[in-house]
Amino acid sequence: IVRMATPSIYGDEQQIVSSDVVRDLEALAEDKNVKAVVLRINSGGGDAYASEQIWHAVSELNKKKPVVVSMGGMAASGAYYMSMGARYVMAQPTTLTGSIGIFGALPDFSDLLTKKLGFKYDEVKTNKNSAYMGAGTARPWSQEEITHLQAYVNRGYALFRKRVADGRKMNVRKLKKSLREESGSERMPRRSN
């Protein structure tokens, strides 16, 4: 699940591009000949923001027409996230699903670029937070930058849990107790709207 199509290191791997999916879901919502929508999802997840965009489009479509998610071999992380906007979610007994979590990777190439390759950097900025994109390349990440990014990840994780709890018709506290990766036969059944 990505925001925009990019070349994959895995070759011709298919990508779920949020802008394309959102456009298609909006078209289905307006199509008078479509009475219900079945989304077949088979993905290990991806970008949290892209998953939120698709979740929103699924939720909006579900207000107009019933949306059913049919999970394939895997519907984990972002794929599970976007499924929670549907009226019904069905998984095969062997579907790997769940994996409710968000992470952010902070690469640090500063030693490679500055010490090994000899790059030199000067930093000119308008305020102390305007150089985030320079962190990890020109210099290591500061603790303050890591703390800000951790807060961003925590907010995304809280939103993810809320989307799942709302979609599963349960409170977040109960959901927290059951957070783990499961197969389709282990996952609690969804209740309909």
Task: Name each model feature, range by range.
Residues 1-65, 74-80, 84-167:
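Small-residue-centered hinge/linker elements
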